[in-house]
Amino acid sequence: MNTLNRRVSPIPYSLHAQGRVMNGAFRIDLRNDGRTAAEFQIQSKPDMDALRSYTVEAGNSLCGWWEGAAGTGEYDLTVHGPNGFFRNFRGVLSGADGRVVEVRTTYDVHPHGVRLELSNPTGQELIVSIFDRYNSRTTAFVVDPGESESRRWAVERTGGWYDLTVTVNGNRTFAMQLAGHVENGEDSVSNRLMEAFA
């Protein structure tokens, strides 16, 4: 099925949301590198906080903190922003033997792409997998203790859209889904997948 739809004009957004366990809680850093203010909405599952809204001015950043669910330490947080910007962070604050990876996202305008920098804050080797929803392909690689690995995905063929899910071998509770659109100042296409995120 062709998920690409009508042509759309460029918009002034360049958004980021980075999540990680820190000081016994889960922290999300929101950053707006665009030219206009952007509103983020963050929804948590039951036993945590309800919906929160954040307005981040152009060139600014904000952060929020969440405790894990009572009794389990589980977290499941979903971030929505303009133009299909989407992040989902799932896991347990204590992790599974500490097997977690930290992810930072950057965008390439020319050539059009999205890049993930994956850092291993633990003392053990991690096997990280990234599932690309657009081509149903999984990439797996090793991140050594205290080291980082960078992987890039071209998005020309998807009209600038991406949808990637990061998991760590041996930790079934941990996952990050990162999806949205990379703006490059040119006309693009809308995308029906943005209405069907898991």
Label every PLM stretch briefly:
Residues 1-23:
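Long, His/Glu/Asp-enriched segments that create or flank divalent metal/ion-associated functional microenvironments
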Residues 16-20, 106-113:
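A structural motif detector for short, solvent-exposed N-terminal "entry" segments of globular domains
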Residues 22-38, 42-44, 112-126, 130-132:
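Asparagine-centered strand-capping/turn motif at beta-strand->loop junctions
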Residues 35, 47-49, 82-84, 134-136, ...:
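Glycine-centered tight beta-turn/hairpin loop motif at sheet-sheet or coil-to-beta transitions
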Residues 37-40, 44-47, 54, 81, ...:
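Predominantly soluble domains enriched in secretory-pathway, periplasmic, or organellar proteins
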Residues 44-72, 132-163:
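Intrinsically disordered, low-complexity Pro/Gly/Ser/Thr-rich segments with frequent PxxP/GP/PP motifs
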Residues 67-111, 155-198:
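Terminal connector regions
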Residues 75, 122, 126-129, 142-147, ...:
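Copper-binding active sites and cupredoxin-like electron-transfer domains
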